[in-house]
Amino acid sequence: PKNLTIFHITGLGAVDKYGLNHLNHSGLVSKVIGGNYGLQIPFMKNLIVGNKIEAYNFPQGILSQMCRTMASKQPGIITKVGLNTYMDPRIEGGKMNKKTKKNLIELIKIGGQEYLFYKAPRPDVAIIRGTSIDNDGYVYMDHEATTREDLSIAQAVHNNGGLVICQFKKFIKKKYTNPHLAKIPSFLIDYYVHDPLQKQTYVTKYDKFRSGERSLKRPKLEKIILDVRKVLARRAALELRRDDVVNLGVGISVGISNIAYEEDIYKDITLTVEAGVIGGIPGSGLNFGTA
């Protein structure tokens, strides 16, 4: 293959030999559409900064919704998200370099009000993963720390006549399994890849607490070192009030979860992260996105 377009929601491949590192070959990638490049591997950043490929940076929430939009064969998403920002085609339209010319976002008017129309791609290959498959090929997420958009991605590619590849860790040998635990039906999947060494996150092999299979009355976390980042996180934590719902992004802000733990106020607030996890103590570093 060559001149591939990569669609990912956030941070696909951050370290070593994982993720997009597999695509580090000359001419293999010509375009990328993503929601986060902060943890992206160097070769992708170099291609973007060097004007070697077309690159778009869209809101993660829009790209997450786009998976369902593509699955239902809708033309795109109409929203006010991004108006008068970097997303607005009157400014930069989410384009990341000079090589990127085509507008994938249009400014439209409905009922006299301005909206942005994010055009839906037509995906033809999906690479997803789960934990287990049963005798019928149904996919289970029993050890996953998050369930992500895997079902919508599989539906989008399948409904577009494409190829769906699913990586999994283990086979379920039981004759009967709880159907409520099956997340992706086998008819959406074309190929399975068995990886018995599949890890839960980049740095965690398997943690039953992150997958929600077990719970602790009080989680055990190491205190983060006292530095400028912690001082900033502590100052932000002073703004928290009982029953607040707090969304934490990757970076300094995720330290607020550690502060909430240290001060024993995490039970009085609800911590969330952009990946969709609600409650608990959000993970930091390469465990970010889990809790």
Regions found by a protein language model. Give the residues of each.
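Conserved alpha/beta enzyme-core scaffold
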Residues: P1-A291
